[in-house]
């Protein structure tokens, strides 16, 4: 790295995982849970030089004695003190950089409240003294990562799902739909249906085990009813999973019943439309002239779109809703778990982007509201 060329930092703060690294890299250097843990009981670890809080993987590994909290709920920061701890951990422990020496690109959920963008801006400039920063919308970055500037992004992470139509690089706010159904809800639902099978998972620590079961064994059925029939008549769909204590459990139709809730939110007692219908509804809120371009560029993004079978099922469901002659294409990049971060890395390393950063000087002159003028 030559001296005059300082790499920008790219931090994608998800509800479940924080992805961080350097602009120009093709993958994030650090990926850790967006968790802050505090000891449940005072002084149980005598002589351990006990800290009053733990972040990320360390909180995860000590989860037995901690109470875990996620500062980002449904994609939006709700606890700023904890959020600051996560950023501090990102810069100093994970990336090992001095934030006052690097421009920082942060990501935000679509329709993020204005006050939140201002608070992010304020913390970056006042707490971390960054020389420059920018806030980009997550779904737009995913679209860039797929090499497009027009399309509709179905972005589903741990805390929230959005359908975001984007035309020539601009998100169309009137047509963005938010669905408060994502990975965390699916983990909770899997906990519930495994309980019905006689396995008990209740604590925050056990929830992480169920999340692992979900990530390793779940898939989306192309035809739910048919899959249920197959599961009932044979054991061909059953898989076993070994718990940390050595006990082995069997998972059957739960494997596809869990992510089916994405298409049928009524499974979770929610009245909202499924992800296929939300995608369709979002497209229908757009100008009739651009719908064709959106149908042909449906881009999946985020960890909750990683289930095997989800792209085929989306293709089938959207085709059933759309006009019969419409060409429909679902794009599911293999790296879509990190495509928001990758898009940020691409954006922050473009030469044309360098004049777009909000500088410390601009912030000092205008205050936090500068973010609304500079970041669309």
UniProtKB/Swiss-Prot annotation:
Modified residues (N-acetylaspartate): 3
Location in the cell: Cytoplasm, Cytoskeleton
Family as reported in the entry's similarity comment: Belongs to the actin family.
Cited SUPFAM superfamilies: Actin-like ATPase domain
Gene: act-1a
UniProt EC number: 3.6.4.-
This protein's name: Actin-1
Pfam families: Actin
